[in-house]
UniProtKB/Swiss-Prot annotation:
It is an enzyme of class 2 (transferase). Dually phosphorylated on Thr-198 and Tyr-200, which activates the enzyme. It comes from Arabidopsis thaliana (Mouse-ear cress). The keyword Transport does not apply. The keyword Nucleotide-binding applies. GO terms for cellular component: cytosol. Residues 40-326 form the Protein kinase domain. SMART domains: S_TKc. This is Mitogen-activated protein kinase 11. The modification Phosphothreonine is found at residues 198, 203.
Amino acid sequence: MSIEKPFFGDDSNRGVSINGGRYVQYNVYGNLFEVSKKYVPPLRPIGRGASGIVCAAWNSETGEEVAIKKIGNAFGNIIDAKRTLREIKLLKHMDHDNVIAIIDIIRPPQPDNFNDVHIVYELMDTDLHHIIRSNQPLTDDHSRFFLYQLLRGLKYVHSANVLHRDLKPSNLLLNANCDLKIGDFGLARTKSETDFMTEYVVTRWYRAPELLLNCSEYTAAIDIWSVGCILGEIMTREPLFPGRDYVQQLRLITELIGSPDDSSLGFLRSDNARRYVRQLPQYPRQNFAARFPNMSVNAVDLLQKMLVFDPNRRITVDEALCHPYLAPLHEYNEEPVCVRPFHFDFEQPSLTEENIKELIYRESVKFNP
């Protein structure tokens, strides 16, 4: 099983030596990359995201091609600065085939005078969003293999006491062998944190009902809802719930899975939230087999168990891995968990941008003593 490897073109920019030859500066589409000299030219632009531009480069010391993400003006505001630090700390803690790995943080030449952060990751060829939008044929075997790897990685993440909170196709990275890795942990939280809703600015299409309804306490079930949305999108090649706003988002959800009855609203602590849901237009549950005619019976059954309004009744990651749809791939002994739970104990309310800059510099020194 394979997918076509995209071609991003070459960049003839050979760079300028700076800081006594220890670093090389490249101009990539007007973005200045300052990288250690071990990353040899050319730098090849391969992507641009909300947090920065990404280039491929060769590590001359290891002979590996890597992805370098430049986060420009990384300390311009406290929210973005925390997001960068959070991802660095989390990915350093994790070690799993289906979670993207940080290989290096390029050490800034001056510890107290830098504004950009350059993070080096494993290089992947593409992401699931691009594959879904492409003309690449996707079979049931593709779907099963993608889903299995996503759940296998998510089992590890959840076992580390972490909720990803931003699972969507563009955050699932792939190579030409169809190996999948979960990326972008900038919005992740531990299960015990209480300030969950702060800074929550991601696309609403993959958000669970409890998030749309501002439920103050939520669980790992929010990630399972997102996985269900992704599974449906792989099969239909279009988003399941492309809502323009919160109101339409809830309507699209209830049009498919049916309006919840009172027994499905127990997770809502707020009387106002329950009243709001009850006054929404009522929809019967659609026939999933008719709505998803290209999905196998087992795939449809698993999708239905993921897209459940009440998070307490939603299938868990461990239950999903044991589902008959994944039986050809499921091996309990090959689905490791994280040995130590992760704690965001470095995140104090009094943390300033300068504090975060110092912490990120320290992380870069660990990679480059």
